[in-house]
Amino acid sequence: MIRIINLRVAVTVKLDIKDIVEKKYPQLRGAIETIHVVRRAVDARKKPNIVFVYTLFVEVHNEAQIMKKLSKQKDVSVFTAEDPEPIVYGNVPLAHRPVVMGFGPAGMLAAFYLAREGYRPIVFERGQDVDTRSEDVETFWKEGVFKPESNVQFGEGGAGTFSDGKLTTRVTHPRLHEISKYFVEFGAPEEILYKHKPHVGTDKLRTMVKAMRERIIEWGGEVRFGAKITDLFIENDRIVGVEVNGSERIDTTVVLSGVGHSARDTYEMLHKRNVEMTAKPFAIGVRIEHDQAVIDESQYGVEPSSLGLGAAEYSLVYHDKETGRTAYSFCMCPGGQVVASASENGGVVVNGMSLYARDSGVANSAIVVNVGPDDFGTHPLDGVAFQREWERKAYELGGSNFHAPAQTVGQFLGLSPAPSVQNSTYSYEPGVVNCDLHDCLPPFVTSVLERALPYWGRRIRGFDDPAVCMTGVETRTSAPLRMGRNEERVSPTVGGFYPMGEGAGYAGGIMSAALDGAETAILCMAKYAKPN
């Protein structure tokens, strides 16, 4: 197979990719069997002359002969695909079915691989199936009726179900492509296999997770909703069972824990049961919203649909010399909305979400500042307490009814006069209250944001416009702790307990969590014998 990199094609070119390749490399005319687009990125640095940059795999007749003709082409090389390592099975017998805690990306992929290989896992998900959950979330957003066990954080698909559905990851691993192909089989658009920054949107994610659940069940797995694991039964430092919903006992010697970063009561239970964990850094801040046209103009210089491009994205970083902290954009959602994402009564949490089409006309992103144990303490649960403190203050500022505190950039920066939130663009439901965001974030966060906003305004025109709305608070950027695990991914303090995914501190996003769940299941199978 031949790999071609850095193939630059103007977005206005309408030729077939095969014609483009043969025009660029005439040595390939008549020799091409198949072309696979591995990656397609957008380069808008010289706007409005925007180009796609392709990486391709090309299968040809007489590869050795063709490569001799192309030997001086630095962007063309022979490529040998690295396949995922084959799954091997251990010889330790399983007296009971393996248990999976949580049905987010990590738990879902762990259960999927276990079921595919005949291990018949039982999944316990505290939240509801995606259809019931979607109704509960819509009711919360429209009416402010909150359900602590069925919300944006808990339920089928995990927190990612109500997000932009980004499938980007900095991780490189042969199994990622295999997982992506499964996602396409279950309803994701085929473009996720090659787009530089693929996304599926919350609408397609809901279809995907349901289809994956049905396949797990078809393969002999079981998925139980409204089923929270409330305790572990441990003998001689090893798992022997789990308690479900405070009463039911399920015997098992293997628990794969894919709980999310918002399962705080589960964190407390696991800490009580001596599961090793340590505090780790994360980031907190606010959501900022702009008219999507402002971002499109800055990034592309033209209206994107005229060139067949989607809503523009951005990624921003600011290194603060005064404090040594870093502010950055996080989970940017083009054409999306800011959503209420609480998982507990008495706290306001915001996040971003968009549909596959990204066509709301409003761009939003978290803008956050790093925090760590030096700020909140070194006890494993100190980060949770820190998050709760600022979420509670946001809840009270908003009126103690899940309305969120919001403020314009002009008000936040102390400009006079400054537009009010009522005259700005905002999308958070059930509603916002014009408040001082300095009252629901630590001073060492707000001071950095005050310096970051003008800096970013010099990079994206209009980013720090005084009328732009910011809504608080964003506190769930990543897990506030990390659970220990050894080379086999087992907890060093509780045998048979496998921490995995974002909630355990080993992933940051849908794809990395899915991969961590799959690889954890594969290592588990390498120890335990395949059931007859």
Residues covered by each model-derived region:
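Residues forming the flavin
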Residues: M1-F52, L56-F162, K166-N532
